[in-house]
């Protein structure tokens, strides 16, 4: 079946370029003078295509490229910085780091060409995200499981004793991000409802540590933090015994049969930083 297709393709070429590539006889086909010239040019073109392809692959190998969507997680930010430090010697560097919620992170991976997204969600939402990712061909890797803690100044009265009742927090000032919502519906009986008259709403995340560092009467609900971040800002994480809401950080990426070296390296660094957090 292949021979007739080849003959037809040759005839189409001859008609398209107005040349005769082969002389046909009962014993076979012999290239004409025009045909030999055409074949030599075609071989040169193919060699050039191979060269361009190899050059493109070489340049791609020299470019450290990574696009990752992350929640507001200090350990993930540290992993991103570690990745940049290791990739700094690359001839080319193309890295996109975007802060995103879980659904937004999924959108960046599925529709916007991002390589990885770290999702953060409550344990009871596991089935939803598992089915969502399975239907869309996304691989999942759990990075961390944790409970929210109280993040306070080391000199705060809250740092010196265990808090057993939310009412104990009413005389302190809560620092919270305007876009941050702890698990549980508005008005639910979960432990997050504290004195609404003593709150600082933060719209610029970098100021949160400065506020806690300078205001011993302030606190915020926080996920695990690297020890060096706590030491740098003179902070401590305190367990709240009545708080048993389990959270998960899960990394997702397209299940395409393998990871690029940059993706493997970032995941390695992310797991390393997760292991160093104070939970």
Protein language model regions, located:
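Short beta-strand->loop
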Residues: 134-145, 222-224, 231-247, 255
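A short LG(V/I)-centered, amphipathic sequence patch enriched
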Residues: 14-31
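Alpha-helical linker/hinge and terminal dimerization helices associated
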Residues: 16, 38-60, 66, 75
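Hydrophobic hinge/microswitch elements
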Residues: 110-115, 179-237
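A late-sequence structural motif
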Residues: 236-279
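N-terminal winged-helix
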Residues: 4, 61-103, 107
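Secondary-structure junction motif
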Residues: 77-82, 126, 165-194
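Flexible hinge/capping segments at coil-to-helix
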Residues: 132-148, 152-174
């Amino acid at each position: 079946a292949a021979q007739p297709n080849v003959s037809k393709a040759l005839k189409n070429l001859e008609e398209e370029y107005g040349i005769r590539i082969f002389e046909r006889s009962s014993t076979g086909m012999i290239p004409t003078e025009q045909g030999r010239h055409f074949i030599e040019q075609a071989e040169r073109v193919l060699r050039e295509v191979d060269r361009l392809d190899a050059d493109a692959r070489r340049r791609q190998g020299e470019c450290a490229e990574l696009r990752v969507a992350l929640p507001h997680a200090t350990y993930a930010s540290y992993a991103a910085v570690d990745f940049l430090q290791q990739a700094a010697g690359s001839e080319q560097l193309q890295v996109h780091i975007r802060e995103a919620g879980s659904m937004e992170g999924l959108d960046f991976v599925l529709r916007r060409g991002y390589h990885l997204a770290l999702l953060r969600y409550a344990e009871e939402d596991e089935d939803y995200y598992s089915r969502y990712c399975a239907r869309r061909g996304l691989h999942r890797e759990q990075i961390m499981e944790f409970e929210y803690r109280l993040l306070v100044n080391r000199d705060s009265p809250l740092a010196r004793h265990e808090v057993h009742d939310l009412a104990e927090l009413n005389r302190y000032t809560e620092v919270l991000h305007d876009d941050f919502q702890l698990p549980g519906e508005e008005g639910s009986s979960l432990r997050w409802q504290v004195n609404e008259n003593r709150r600082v709403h933060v719209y610029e995340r970098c100021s949160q540590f400065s506020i806690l560092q300078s205001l011993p009467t302030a606190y915020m609900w926080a996920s695990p933090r690297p020890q060096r971040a706590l030491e740098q800002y003179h902070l401590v994480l305190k367990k709240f015994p009545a708080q048993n809401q389990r959270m998960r950080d899960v990394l997702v990426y397209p299940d395409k049969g393998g990871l690029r070296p940059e993706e493997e390296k970032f995941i390695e660094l992310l797991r390393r930083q997760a292991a160093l957090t104070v939970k």
